[in-house]
Swiss-Prot record:
Keyword Calcium tagged: no
Broadest EC class assigned to this enzyme: transferase
Coiled-coil ranges per UniProt: none
InterPro entries: Thymidate_synth/dCMP_Mease (IPR045097), Thymidate_synth/dCMP_Mease_dom (IPR023451), Thymidate_synth/dCMP_Mease_sf (IPR036926), Thymidylate_synthase (IPR000398), Thymidylate_synthase_AS (IPR020940)
Catalytic machinery residues: C160 (nucleophile)
Primary location: cytoplasm
Residues at which dUMP binds: R22, R180, S181, C182, D183, N191, H221, I222, Y223
Subunit: Homodimer.
Protein's recorded name: Thymidylate synthase
Pathway(s) this gene product operates in, as recorded in its UniProt entry: Pyrimidine metabolism; dTTP biosynthesis
UniProt keywords, alphabetically: Cytoplasm, Methyltransferase, Nucleotide biosynthesis, Transferase
Residues that hold (6R)-5,10-methylene-5,6,7,8-tetrahydrofolate according to the record: D183, S282
GO molecular function ontology, one term from the record: thymidylate synthase activity
Organism per entry: Pasteurella multocida (strain Pm70)
């Protein structure tokens, strides 16, 4: 919580107003933010200064792991996070590549699991990483990226948290995740849960110890219609101790994550929080 609250306060104190063309709103913005999550000691970075809905965040990332490209599949997992971008984004609604209701196009997990090569074949970035790590291999390129400029027009949204790099020191696994843009009041709440959980899951299915996860954000911002709630409500609250995340130990392979895992396989204990804050969401 310390890094999160420091970032929120930094944006309020030092941020510069920037017009955002996509949303038509102004954002109070800072450049370069670093957060660290202690996965080894299970310090689950669940926001305590407002109620945080962690299941939706994990469900969304599980959908990425499975390479889903349809908002309906994400809803089945337990999250509606792609409903708006798939069905209410005017640019995507008018895109000839859109296949119909709930179609997201070639975004996020599609790129991670089926990156297209010039010859039409695909690369499964995630499986390569899992296979290497299970065999104790770190080739300094254990990288999964969703950022494919050659196919931006084939999806409803460019990836915000776009690249994940795994590093192995002995039998301890580390993760560094890169994010080009972050809606701090809403998006960061999800993203830090996902970074933590991704490292925890990958360590579990590759038989390694989880170390720390490093989260690097380029453009961190608060939208103008979120600022009052952040300054006068959330930042006035004292944080509670962090909770712990418990993952079903029967999850042992990538195939498990692809097939039978549900939100019932994740539990959070020791979570105390303040009341929810309804921040506006910008499509």
């Amino acid at each position: 919580m310390k890094h999160y609250l420091e970032l929120c306060q930094r944006i309020v104190d030092e941020g510069v107003w920037v017009e955002n063309a996509r949303t038509g709103k102004r954002c109070l913005t800072v450049i370069d933010a670093d957060l660290t999550y202690d996965v080894a000691n299970n310090q689950f970075p669940l926001i305590t200064t407002r109620k945080s809905y962690w299941k939706a965040a994990i469900a969304e990332f599980l959908g990425y792991i499975r390479g889903y490209d349809n908002a309906a599949d994400f809803r089945k997992l337990g999250t509606k996070t792609w409903d708006a971008n798939a069905n209410e984004n005017s640019a995507w609604l008018n895109n000839p590549h859109r296949k119909g209701t709930d179609d997201m196009g070639r975004v996020y997990g599609v790129q991670g699991r089926a990156w297209r090569k010039p010859n039409g074949e695909t690369v499964d970035q995630l499986r390569k990483i899992v296979n290497n790590l299970r065999n104790g291999i770190d080739d300094r390129g254990e990288i999964m990226t969703f950022f494919n400029p050659g196919e931006f027009e084939l999806g409803c949204l460019r990836p915000c948290m776009h690249t994940h790099t795994f590093s192995l020191l002995g039998d301890t696994l580390y993760l560094t995740s890169y994010q080009r843009s972050c809606d701090v009041p809403l998006g960061l709440n999800f993203n830090q849960i996902q970074v933590f959980t991704f490292l925890a899951l990958m360590a579990q299915i590759t038989g390694k110890k989880a170390g720390k996860a490093y989260h690097k954000i380029i453009n961190a911002h608060i939208y103008e219609d979120q600022l009052d709630l952040m300054k006068n409500v959330q930042l006035k609250r004292d944080p509670f101790p962090l909770p712990q995340l418990h993952i079903n130990p029967e999850i042992k392979t990538l195939e498990d994550l692809e097939t039978w895992v549900t939100m019932d396989d994740f539990k959070v204990t020791g979570y105390q929080c303040h009341d929810a804050i309804k921040y506006p969401f910008s499509v």
